[in-house]
Amino acid sequence: MNFSVEDLKTVDAWRVSQGAPLRVAKSIPTSFDIADSGDWISLPDGSQVWQLHLQAKGAIALILYYSDFYIPKGARLYLYNAAKTQVLGAYTHRTHPKNGPFATQAVAGDEVILEYVPAPSGETPRLRIREVGYGYNHLEAIMPEVQEAPGAGYSEACEVNINCEEGTDWQEQKKG
């Protein structure tokens, strides 16, 4: 998919002047699935991890949107940038126990690596990436580490704050 970041910024500036919300990323439709994308890597101890490397040249950050996100109990998923200066996770079964659609926080840079560590049970995960958000503008709005730590009760704009009405379905998980 080809597009001009400068053209996007020009259109965004006009949209914001008309009262539209700030746009920080362009969604790029994709189809990556743990079942048929990425590589399984054997480690010296005999265990295996799955890795998927995604790159979108020139992006400030990448955001992943999943059509299905299920991590079996005992398994872990990590996301990190190429320099490993930002590591997200471990995402576990407790992160999103109902499975289904999900989005992960923005990862700085134009590359993201997903690394899945399987559960001892061998249960199959479901990781289906349907879109990559190509972050191109207003980095401070999508990268919390650029801002002062917000404190308890805070959630990103696209996340549900479990202390609010929208978080009613997450009260069991809130208790830990």
Tell me the role of every PLM-derived stretch.
Residues M1-G176:
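Domain-level representation of secreted and single-pass membrane ectodomains enriched
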